[in-house]
Amino acid sequence: MARDDVIEVDGKVIEALPNATFKVELDNKHVVLCRISGKMRMHYIRIALGDRVKLELTPYSLDRGRITFRYK
């Protein structure tokens, strides 16, 4: 079920950090700290450096996000 108050943006993974956390550079050159969503973790979807991903940002904190989709 999608939330109404999230902001969906696309970006590119630039750094992998511990505990399934990544630094993602958005299309507008901002860098966001992101974690993998629960469904992606449950289905063992792997994310590597350079992958294009879709993120969800909340309006409350625009420097943290959740990775919800990895483009092929």
Swiss-Prot record:
It is found in: Cytoplasm. PROSITE patterns: S1_IF1_TYPE. Residues 1-72 form the S1-like domain. Pfam families: eIF-1a. One of its GO terms (cellular component) is cytosol. This is Translation initiation factor IF-1. Its main location: cytoplasm. GO terms for molecular function: ribosome binding; rRNA binding; translation initiation factor activity. Keywords: Cytoplasm, Initiation factor, Protein biosynthesis, RNA-binding, rRNA-binding. The gene is infA. It comes from the Bacteria. Belongs to the IF-1 family. InterPro entries: NA-bd_OB-fold, RNA-binding_domain_S1_IF1, S1_domain, TIF_IF1. SUPFAM superfamilies: Nucleic acid-binding proteins. One of the essential components for the initiation of protein synthesis. Stabilizes the binding of IF-2 and IF-3 on the 30S subunit to which N-formylmethionyl-tRNA(fMet) subsequently binds. Helps modulate mRNA selection, yielding the 30S pre-initiation complex (PIC). Upon addition of the 50S ribosomal subunit IF-1, IF-2 and IF-3 are released leaving the mature 70S translation initiation complex. The lineage of its organism: Bacteria, Pseudomonadati, Campylobacterota, Epsilonproteobacteria, Campylobacterales. Component of the 30S ribosomal translation pre-initiation complex which assembles on the 30S ribosome in the order IF-2 and IF-3, IF-1 and N-formylmethionyl-tRNA(fMet); mRNA recruitment can occur at any time during PIC assembly. It comes from Helicobacter acinonychis (strain Sheeba).
